[in-house]
């Protein structure tokens, strides 16, 4: 069976907050859910590095890469196997891996409920006139699109040129057979 999952980027804004900051609002959202849950599952980055590029090299140290403590504050691994986290300046939910489309939809809907519960809890600790708005599959005011995106699992030993050679024709033609 093929392993699949859905990774959804959500837009966020706060009504009646003149100094709105999407990063801080996303952090509040994520950590409101964490407060609801009693335990925290740690994310294991042992075999990965955010500085390792798919083309086979590593970047020099990046000041924008979060420390382990910062990473703990912006990442939640949920008991259902999903990941709920701040990705740049928006909340993101990555469903657990499944082996069929039905389960994929079930866990995507679970993500929507988690976002709504988090929003409700975050609003409870916010000033009463502020309302948190979460958007699924949208574009922000700068023209950045947010929605679903896909990931492909492959061995790091595969040369980047080979990835490009085989994936580019697929990316260019998939609209024909997937719509």
Question: How would you name each of these model-derived features?
Answer:
Residues 1-135, 144, 164-179:
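Terminal catalytic/cofactor-binding subdomain
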Residues 138-155:
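Histidine-centered divalent-metal-coordination microenvironment in nucleic-acid enzymes
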Residues 159-161:
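A short alpha->loop->secondary-structure connector
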